Curated annotation (Swiss-Prot):
Enzyme Commission number, as recorded: 2.5.1.19
Family recorded in the similarity comment: Belongs to the EPSP synthase family.
Protein name per UniProt: 3-phosphoshikimate 1-carboxyvinyltransferase
Reactions the enzyme catalyzes: 3-phosphoshikimate + phosphoenolpyruvate = 5-O-(1-carboxyvinyl)-3-phosphoshikimate + phosphate
Source organism of the structure: Rhizobium etli (strain ATCC 51251 / DSM 11541 / JCM 21823 / NBRC 15573 / CFN 42)
CDD domains: EPSP_synthase
Gene name as annotated: aroA
Catalytic class of the enzyme: transferase
Key word Cytoplasm present: yes
Functional description taken from the UniProt entry: Catalyzes the transfer of the enolpyruvyl moiety of phosphoenolpyruvate (PEP) to the 5-hydroxyl of shikimate-3-phosphate (S3P) to produce enolpyruvyl shikimate-3-phosphate and inorganic phosphate.
PROSITE patterns noted in UniProt: EPSP_SYNTHASE_1
Keywords linked to the UniProt accession: Amino-acid biosynthesis, Aromatic amino acid biosynthesis, Cytoplasm, Transferase
Record GO terms (molecular function): 3-phosphoshikimate 1-carboxyvinyltransferase activity
Amino acid sequence: MTRTAKLTIIPPGKPLSGRAMPPGSKSITNRALLLAGLAKGTSRLTGALKSDDTRYMADALRAMGVAIDEPDDTTFVVTGSGRLTPPKAPLFLGNAGTATRFLTAAAALVDGTVIVDGDEHMRKRPIGPLVEAMRKLGIDVSAETGCPPVTVRGTGRFEADRILIDGGLSSQYVSALLMMAAGGDRPVDIELVGEDIGALGYIDLTTAAMKAFGAKVEKTSPVTWRVEPTGYRAADFVIEPDASAATYLWAAEVLSDGRIDLGVPNDAFTQPDAKAYETIAKFPHLPAEIDGSQMQDAVPTIAVLAAFNETPVRFVGIANLRVKECDRIRALSSGLNNIREGLAVEEGDDLIVHSDPALAGQTLPAEIDTFADHRIAMSFALAGLKIGGITILDPDCVGKTFPAYWRTLATLGVTYRDKD
């Protein structure tokens, strides 16, 4: 397939309007795929996301003996035996952080050796804290560089019953350990420590999905969970639309003074990034300081929106954005300053956007380096709704989580010029 090298957004001459349903949640789809793969029996996952990230997860599970059928564009039918088997080759997961971290932990339940690997971007993303936490349970696991590839020599048995992990690190580590623990041989307590507890909402997503597949997990304190060794049972599971994807549509609506029907009430989302709706709705009077710690994937959306705000905006609690698909703080400041020098500045791990509503209606030719990051591409497309000359490099990277993004904007009234 030929990839599009560049895509220039042409600012629409009228408000965007129409119906645009976000795809299924990536976060929930990958959790449900793993839990269904660990379960005994056949599960039906509906409303699922079919994208690069979820295909990596599905293919890895197939390599470990799970049967997965795809009867339509939003359904997975998953049949597991209750145990994963050692794959014949290393699991290649591209730059899919959820799949990599979740499967690294799940590999401990395999009776044999599993190598979890990814592309050149994934090989720069840290996984050391998860590896260390697994070692505390007596699991034989190694990652020489602190990043993938990771080698796990599993047995399905643990030598300890308690894990302490820094709550300021990626919530994906905690979710990975929780899902793994239910497949072990003894109850396990998982406790977050440290002053900064980030992205608790994603942990809530994990425990809700675990319970739907028969696990017994109890929150024994605000930062502690006890997981019983119940294993998982097959279930039919409905996946809600992706709240992170919805943020682009909410922002497009307020930027264009349009009316976009997402097909789902804003308060129906259970994902943490849905919190962004209340913030986005305040545009062009966004708060002077926005804490992104509990809605991390929405920060790029709001940061680009902030460029057109009435007053400057400081983003705090976003240090983890430096170890996403790219250094998103650096990518955001670079892209905004490429539009106009001085539009953004980094102060430590904070990002300050020096908003200027007068940007709207100007022509400021700028090529935006996406760093192969889907969220950078989708967020900076929003700038192109108000500024002429915004060109997105490697626009096809949106296939990671929202393959139909450009087509969706087009149905709402956005047009493009592309160059292969």
